[in-house]
Amino acid sequence: MIKLTPPMGWNSWNTFGENINEKMIFETADVMAESGLRDKGYEYLVIDDCWSLRERDENGRLVPDPEKFPHGMKAVADYVHSKGLKFGMYSCAGNMTCAGYPGSYEHEFVDAETFASWDVDFLKYDYCYHSPILHGKYLYRRMGLALENCGRDILFSACSWGADETHEWIKETGASMWRSTGDIFDTWDSVKDLVAQQEKLHPYNGVGCFNDMDMLIVGMHGKGNVGLAGCSDVQYQTHYALWAFLGSPLMIGCDIRSMSDETKAILMDKDIIAVNQDPAGRQPYQVLAHPDYPVWAKQMDNGDIVLAYFNLGEHNFNQFVTWADIGIERSSGVKLEVTDLWSKQTLGTFDTGIEFGAVVPHGCRILRCRVVRG
């Protein structure tokens, strides 16, 4: 499957871990459809690890845990589809999944056929307990080939954590998205750590094969499977803006059945989502390079430029960007009309540059700039 914009959806792992069941999945599908998330673009509902029995059946096929999913996975898929959503599942390139359930190693084709028979639309494919002999590219090529021949269009999400220089070979596998890092946790330090690993990977991200910075922690507040210290709403807003601006898939990880208004506002901001889903799929570039106070720019398909200032430091800090910094010389006569994407305020038309103002620690400001001539 070729995906033209970063996939969006929800995944069970961050909050629920192995504590998943049919009732919770149905309730989550209901909320995705009724809250507005689906209509904002969150279309995939993905069940992560721990959904199967510990052993395959006598025919070598994976078996859903009947206590967790008493009606089977086809019934779950049917319910998810009835809500206008797409259904995702999980497996692993090793002989076991990360939680110790059967993996797909040397069962790639039979498992792909099984997923297709359940009407699965998305497969997250992890990298635990993988063969020490085979390079990751061979293991992911195997499942990619199996999915391409299973008789159903299934989005392939490769989760190899950036191991074995994933970025150099992942497009060979047919994957539409690929994890570039280890797992995220619900802390500000985890967000900063994952962002710091992205700069060298920008050339490998884009239309058809997106760099996955891991699921979102927005709205978790220290609860759930990867919940640790938690983050403030300001930090969650910056985390979301970073993932969106850098072109990562946007996979919600909180329990959306109990979202706060603040969480909803972050996850459903149409203007930030539009930056992530821009059809050009261009990568951002640094305008002002600073480890704690960077400013990035990104060119949109319609010619607009988005400027993003992320305060990753511990002090209020102002930044100023001149239009020359983004390639517009004063002699061109070009001005930029600037809109703040979070506040929705039009700030005015500027002919030489713009001052961001003092952004609070761990906060951000995202400005969309429209070219005005004459």
Residue ranges and their predicted role:
Residues W243-L246, M251-G253, A289-R330:
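Carbohydrate-binding surface patches
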Residues G348-G374:
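C-terminal beta-strand-rich structural cap/linker in extracellular carbohydrate-active enzymes
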Residues T238-L288:
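Catalytic cores of secreted or luminal carbohydrate-active enzymes
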Residues W13-T15, C50, C92-M96, C128-H130, ...:
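Active-site beta-loop-alpha junctions enriched in small/polar residues
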Residues D325-K344:
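Solvent-exposed beta-hairpin/edge-strand motifs
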Residues P6-S12, G41-I47, K86-S91, D121-D126, ...:
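Structural recognition of the beta-strand scaffold that forms the well-ordered cores
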